[in-house]
Design a protein with these regions (language model features):
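Helix-coil boundary and interhelical linker segments in multi-pass alpha-helical membrane proteins
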Residues: 30-39, 122-131, 151-160
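Structural signature of multi-pass alpha-helical membrane transport proteins
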Residues: 1-12, 23-32, 177-230
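Transmembrane alpha-helices that form the ion-translocation and gating core
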Residues: 43-75, 109, 113-127, 222-227
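Cytoplasmic-side transmembrane-helix entry/capping segments in multi-pass membrane proteins
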Residues: 7-21, 40-45, 66-76, 98-106, ...
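Transmembrane alpha-helix boundary signature
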Residues: 2-10, 26-40, 56-69
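Alpha-helical membrane segments and immediately flanking helix-loop junctions
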Residues: 67-114, 131-154
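Juxtamembrane and boundary regions of transmembrane helices in multi-pass small-molecule transporters
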Residues: 57-64, 114-139, 164-195
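Entry/N-cap segments of selected transmembrane alpha helices
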Residues: 19, 24-56, 101-113, 230
Length: 230
């Protein structure tokens, strides 16, 4: 739609998305991470990187995907936390906008299916509510869809699913940082053999991730000072 030139900087969708990702960090509270215990942290912080790496390798070795940037963006999207991770990783590996759009589109399709199918399947096999919630939190992509799917099972499943996904969201920054290093030093390695400097990695690193971590630290500190009533 038509809008005057002076307002164009304020209607760039990219900045709204990045601002939303910074605000997403406000929900990652460290006291809740500790409260869920070792099993939940294991699912989010150990299984997720394994899935990310194995998905990327599968895309390169088996599917023979010609674009490594598309491959890693889809891998992060499907393994970490959906569009949020895709946006961060796409910035780190300098993926094309079309590749990011495709990754997010695939995520939305599978999320819509899993949001309905997983609760039904979990009920069918009789899995305990807490375990079902953890499974949903670790596999369904977007945070809102995780909450909706968990609510289908019950209040305990909702709480566990949302907490596992919240813990998983911490890996947005870690994934972006690791991808920035990998693509700068391995995928786009210089022909003259010269080492990639720290500035190149810094330029690749999506700066809104710092805001994400900052929001998490600030809100976690406030929550800790207020107590359990927050």
């Amino acid at each position: 739609f038509f809008h005057p030139k002076w307002i164009k900087p304020a209607v760039q969708v990219e900045y709204y998305i990045k601002a939303g990702l910074v605000l997403l960090g406000a929900e990652v509270l460290f006291n809740k991470i500790l409260a869920i215990g070792i099993p939940g942290i294991f699912v989010a912080w150990v299984v997720t990187p394994i899935v990310l790496g194995s998905t990327f390798i599968f895309g390169q070795k088996v599917l023979k995907m010609p674009s490594k940037t598309l491959n890693i963006t889809i891998s992060a999207d499907m393994s970490v936390c959906g569009p949020s991770a895709a946006i961060a990783v796409a910035a780190a590996c300098r993926a094309k906008k079309e590749e990011l759009t495709l990754s997010v589109g695939l995520s939305m399709v599978f999320t819509a299916i899993m949001m309905v199918a997983m609760p039904a399947f979990i009920k069918m096999i009789g899995l305990p509510e807490v375990l079902g919630g953890a499974w949903i939190g670790g596999t369904v992509d977007s945070t809102g869809s995780v909450a909706a799917a968990g609510a289908f099972l019950g209040p305990k499943a909702l709480q566990v699913a949302a907490t596992v996904k919240m813990i998983q969201n911490v890996l947005i920054g870690v994934s972006a940082f690791c991808v920035a290093i990998y693509f700068a030093t391995k995928v786009e390695k210089r022909d003259d053999g010269q080492q990639v400097g720290a500035m190149e990695i810094w330029n690749r690193f999506p700066k809104f991730v710092i805001g994400f971590l900052g929001a998490s630290i600030v809100l976690s500190t406030i929550a800790g000072s207020i107590g359990a009533d927050l």
